[in-house]
Design a protein with these regions (language model features):
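Mid-domain alpha/beta scaffold segments of enzyme catalytic cores
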Residues: 1-174, 182-190, 198-209, 214-217, ...
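Short secondary-structure boundary segments
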Residues: 39-40, 226-227, 254-256
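Short, charged, surface-exposed secondary-structure boundary motifs
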Residues: 45-48, 213, 231-239, 261
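Mid-to-C-terminal alpha-helical segments outside catalytic/metal-binding sites
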Residues: 144, 267-275
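Conserved active-site and cofactor/substrate-binding residues in soluble primary-metabolism enzymes
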Residues: 182, 236, 262-265, 269
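His/Asp/Glu-enriched short active-site or ligand-binding loop at hydrolase and phosphoryl-transfer sites
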Residues: 219-233
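Short acidic/histidine-rich active-site segments
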Residues: 245-264
Length: 275
């Protein structure tokens, strides 16, 4: 007879700093040992910007979850870590000064990675960020991760519709079936040029459109989010990937975020699917 004991787990990518107390208590009751909060996205708190966010905004996106993480640990009894990076889902000004803050932030024991970040054709608030400019900012973050020898969480974009969000989006015309691979190729060209060790790289939001490429053409870890109702990946999908390819390099995460529907039990359900 299979054991029904709760299996501890780590949620390697989430945005739960925007969640209420009760949601944290629910997550804490599922056996979670630790979470890694990805900071840098203003939409987590349902903010609407009329002007391009600047250095003070970015500092707040990062420092608020860093401060919150210690309180959350004391209240909910599991470890809370943070990754910091400039997300291209929101255009920002003064990004050079923002990047200068990262080395000092990474000295904090609860800040463990750069990211999530990755070239994205879609920006919130209709404030388009040209791809060529994104490449420059992205490369600087990759170089920083290599220099500091810290994990790098790579965001791969998902096709989006304005109705799924709180405000107008600046959108892309790349076909859905080519979407992730097209922008992942741009990211990987820069990552390989800089020489970032793939063992320090997590390629996140992986789905069937890029799975084979990531498995065969990289040595990176493979992040699959199972907790958002907006995504097509779910506990059953993760279990299917494990059955087809084995567990090596695979990382499950919730990618919970406050502006879409979420399944707070998604990772425990994934563990059950794997039994």
């Amino acid at each position: 007879m299979a054991s029904s004991a709760v299996i501890p787990y780590i949620d390697s990518h989430c945005h739960t700093h925007g969640f209420p107390y009760d949601a944290w208590e629910t997550i804490g009751s599922t056996g979670v040992a630790a979470v890694v909060i990805s900071a840098g996205n203003p939409h987590v708190h349902r903010e609407i910007h009329d002007e391009v966010p600047d250095l003070n905004d970015v500092r707040r996106y990062w420092e608020e979850p860093i401060r919150f993480s210690k309180s959350a640990e004391n209240m909910h009894f599991f470890k809370v870590f943070v990754g910091v990076g400039i997300s291209f889902m929101t255009r920002v000004d003064q990004w050079e000064q923002a990047l200068d803050l990262i080395p000092e932030l990474l000295k904090k024991s609860n800040v463990v990675a750069i990211g999530e970040t990755g070239i994205d054709p879609v920006q919130y608030f209709g404030m388009r960020w040209p791809i060529e400019e994104q490449k420059i900012v992205f490369e600087e973050q990759v170089r920083l991760a290599k220099k500091l020898d810290v994990p790098f969480i790579l965001h791969t974009p998902t096709p989006k519709k304005s109705r799924d969000f709180l405000h107008e989006l600046a959108v892309s015309e790349i076909p859905n079936e080519e979407y992730k691979r097209y922008f992942l190729d741009l990211d990987m060209e820069i990552i390989n040029k800089v020489g970032l060790d793939h063992k320090r790289l997590v390629i996140d939001h992986v789905d069937e459109t890029i799975l084979e490429y990531v498995l065969e053409e990289t040595d990176a870890y493979i992040g699959i989010g199972v907790g958002q109702t907006m995504r097509h990946t779910n506990p059953q999908y993760f279990a299917d990937v494990v059955e087809r390819h084995g567990p090596d390099r695979l990382m499950v995460n919730s990618d919970h975020v406050a502006y879409v529907g979420n399944d707070l039990l998604a990772i425990p359900k994934t563990i059950r699917e794997l039994r």
